[in-house]
């Protein structure tokens, strides 16, 4: 079983999968009589149809036992999905490029520093939310509308991957 190496979450490394939502290194302009920095358009919400709506939810997540066997990934073919940590805790992200099915050899893992969120582009394969804290909360921005917006892909046993938070790239 291949063990994923967890990479630091950077805009450049994550670009094939979506957007890193963070203020560090991002452009801003002043608003509210000069008292507020607006970090504008850090990500774009994608929806497939004009009648779709962008919605905001809160996910209250519990940690899964680690190391974790990655048995499946999901994608949202009709819209993007963003996760923004509300409690400032680091969390893990597992993704694979666009395609009919995720290729195990192309799956990558990242660690958010707790001040970064992610916006998965429409159709990008990813694991459901992976907190490393006992409990965590995320502001989620995604799509509401008709049609199935969640495809799941289950790896065969020989394709499964191992996610170990100790396997960090240096």
From Swiss-Prot:
Keyword Cell inner membrane: no
Gene3D superfamilies reported in the protein's UniProt record: Ureidoglycolate hydrolase
Entries under Pfam families matching the protein: Ureidogly_lyase (PF04115)
CDD domains per the UniProt record, alphabetical: cupin_UAH
UniProt keyword list: Lyase, Purine metabolism
Enzyme Commission numbers on file: 4.3.2.3
Keyword Lyase: yes
SUPFAM superfamilies: RmlC-like cupins (SSF51182)
Catalytic activities: (S)-ureidoglycolate = urea + glyoxylate
Family matches, as InterPro entries: RmlC_Cupin_sf (IPR011051), UAH_cupin (IPR047233), Ureidogly_lyase (IPR007247), Ureidogly_lyase_bac (IPR023525), Ureidoglycolate_lyase_dom_sf (IPR024060)
A biological process term (GO) from this entry: allantoin catabolic process
Molecular functions (GO terms): ureidoglycolate hydrolase activity; ureidoglycolate lyase activity
Highest taxon of the lineage: Bacteria
Pathway field: Nitrogen metabolism; (S)-allantoin degradation
Requisite cofactors: Ni(2+)
Broad EC category: lyase
Family: Belongs to the ureidoglycolate lyase family.
PANTHER family tied to this protein: UREIDOGLYCOLATE HYDROLASE (PTHR21221), UREIDOGLYCOLATE LYASE (PTHR21221:SF1)
Chain's role: Catalyzes the catabolism of the allantoin degradation intermediate (S)-ureidoglycolate, generating urea and glyoxylate. Involved in the utilization of allantoin as nitrogen source.
Quaternary assembly: Homodimer.
NCBIfam families, per database record: PRK03606.1-2, PRK13395.1
Designated name of the protein: Ureidoglycolate lyase
Originating organism: Stutzerimonas stutzeri (strain A1501)
